[in-house]
UniProtKB/Swiss-Prot annotation:
This is Nuclear respiratory factor 1. Residues 1-78 are annotated as: Dimerization. Its main location: nucleus. Belongs to the NRF1/Ewg family. Pfam families: Nrf1_DNA-bind. Residues 40-57 have a biased composition (Acidic residues). One of its GO terms (molecular function) is DNA-binding transcription factor activity, RNA polymerase II-specific. Transmembrane segments: none annotated. It is found in: Nucleus. Probable transcription factor that is required for normal development of the outer retina. It comes from Danio rerio (Zebrafish).
Amino acid sequence: MEDHTVHQTEHMTTIEAHAVSQQVGQVHVATYTEHGMLSADEDSPSSPDDDAYDDSDILNSTGTDEVTAHLAAAGPVGMAAAAAVATGKKRKRPHIFESNPSIRKRQQTRLLRKLRATLDEYTTRVGQQAIVLCISPSKPNPVFRVFGAAPLENVVRKYKSMILEDLENALAEHAPPGGGELSSELPPLTIDGIPVSVDKMTQAQLRAFIPEMLKYSTGRGKPGWGKESCKPIWWPEDIPWANVRSDVRTEEQKQRVSWTQALRTIVKNCYKQHGREDLLYAFEDQVTTQVATTATHSIAHLVPSQTVVQTISNPDGTVSLIQVGTGATVATLADASELPGTVTVAQVNYSTVTDGEVEQNWATLQGGEMTIQTTQASEATQAVASLAEAAVAASQEMQTGATVTMALNRYSLEGALKFGEAAAHAVATLAEATLQGGGQIVLAGETAAAVGALTGVPDGSGLVQIPVSMYQTVVTSLAQGNRPVQVAMAPVTTRIDNTMTLDGQAVEVVTLEQ
């Protein structure tokens, strides 16, 4: 019994010794791992996934990239931006350079705020001296922004001039040959040293840029405003030779072309005259509309697209509608007073009859979602009518007597409730622009119910088919009855329920059969 106890005790002692040994091993491994992590922090490059970053070949990896090449050729600031973009691409980050200066400024503010929060968390949790340093070596006022833990932040500020000098020398070594030749004839279009397309320049930027451009174009130190002898031959005839900081055109000219668009025309004319149109459009994506033609029916099918338009108030009181993305001016409105919230010209659908068979051929033209905050109601209706007419003109000509179903999404605008005759006139203009003689307009939903109530046929689920010549009369009647006006689209199989007579014109009340 005693021998068994001794044996068991020895066995337990062996197990305990093994456990202690295992614990020691775990402690050793943990210590080694922690030491390895610290060593990795000390020795690793700025991106731990990569090898030590070699800036001797900084632009070769992106030499074929048009954005980087364009930046590198724009001077020291552009070269610094190109090197930064190349660094991010070498590390396979999924981001791209933002070519729009306004959007780039917003992104800069957002990301700097995010960096500050991350840096504060890092210094507090980890307990290390860390900073964020942002530099743009432009002259004479370079951007040097540093924030982070003290006293490291103050130490870096102390060596600002040395850091800037070393950075400029390093960038000069990588600058492409002949990078400064662009400014020998005309200055490149740049905002804060970064190239920009002329269509993305704001009015304030254009007003500040044009006098500098004139120095290069005319060779004079001052433009000589008001002196016809100093006026360049490329200056637009419809723009007075006067200081561009104010618009002195006639009211008619202001109504026709916005001041921002006129300033862009000045810049374009100058660069075209000097044969440097290549400098006008930096990073511009050439977007072409793809049109597929069906051989059997010869019907043009336009790929649906959504055009977003933003408003810009001009100093002369006009409001320009600028297409987001391209910067092109869609329309210029005369006054900046009341205008409803959102206008969308949505779809134009039509069906034709060929050899006794009904075929549905769709031309979807989703053109121009406009968020408009200020203008007159009459301007709104004219803008909608113009957009719709342009959309219809883009589609194939329709046969006489074809049935068209149209929609003006969200064009209730409290429709006839608020604007009455103006709204009715705009929609009637759309109808007349779309249909040839003998065509029909199909109303649905609430509008159909309203027309049904007017004609004594209260069928809220049906469609109302109205001749083009009578459409404005019907819509005006709805407006006077405080009904929202909407022209609905949905060419589907219908069943005629009733035929009414309205002012001598036949009005058919039909019901959907889906």
